[in-house]
């Protein structure tokens, strides 16, 4: 009886965990790379917050697309907040695709998110960048050129990532 129960638990874990490793993030596919191209200019407002990319020229920008229901986004958020505190010279712009403003606000409160955030439920900005997976982050240099696209929830404290950010 106990071995049958243990086997059932293992099967359940395999059904839940395996897809996470196979599909990584909340990604549904890939679009052509925009690396090396000028980042699309955008201005987005959700009635409470707004972001205009042109206001960040001259700064290194991490443009992060996320959703409150996305597991990897939940894992990544504390690291982005920590990076924001350690590197105030970086502009970390977080664009949520949440349709529910309540879920968006609860997420921000739960994780004490003090990044520049905006809710874009129609995914207008995500579509401009060819984003269809979450989390997805574009690293944009001081001249507005996309230098790297990061899909999933990387370790933002990784020395290689930190060194790359220093070069921009």
PLM features: residue spans?
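Signature tryptophan residues that serve as conserved aromatic anchors
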Residues: 42, 66-69, 156
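Structural microenvironment flanking redox-active thiols in thiol-disulfide oxidoreductases
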Residues: 74-111, 121-127
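A short beta-strand-turn-helix
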Residues: 41-61
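Short pre-active-site segment immediately N-terminal to redox-active cysteine/selenocysteine motifs
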Residues: 59-61, 65-69, 133
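N-terminal targeting signals for export/organelle localization
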Residues: 1-47, 158-168
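Hydrophobic beta-strand core positions in alpha/beta domains
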Residues: 62-64, 94, 139
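Thiol/disulfide oxidoreductase modules built on the thioredoxin-like
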Residues: 106-113, 121-166
């Amino acid at each position: 009886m106990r071995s049958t129960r243990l086997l059932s638990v293992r099967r359940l874990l395999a059904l839940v965990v395996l897809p996470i490793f196979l599909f990584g993030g909340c990604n549904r596919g890939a679009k052509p790379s925009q690396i090396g191209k000028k980042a699309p200019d955008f201005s987005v407002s959700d009635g409470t917050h707004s972001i205009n990319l042109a206001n960040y020229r001259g700064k290194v920008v991490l443009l992060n697309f996320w959703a409150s229901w996305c597991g990897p986004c939940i894992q990544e958020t504390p690291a982005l907040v920590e990076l924001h505190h350690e590197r105030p010279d970086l502009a970390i712009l977080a664009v949520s695709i949440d349709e529910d403003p309540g879920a968006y606000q609860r997420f921000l409160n739960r994780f004490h998110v003090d990044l520049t955030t905006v809710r874009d439920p129609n995914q207008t900005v995500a579509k401009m960048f060819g984003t269809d997976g979450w989390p997805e982050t574009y690293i944009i240099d001081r001249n507005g050129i996309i230098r790297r696209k990061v899909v999933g929830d990387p370790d933002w404290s990784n020395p290689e990532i930190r060194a790359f950010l220093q070069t921009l």
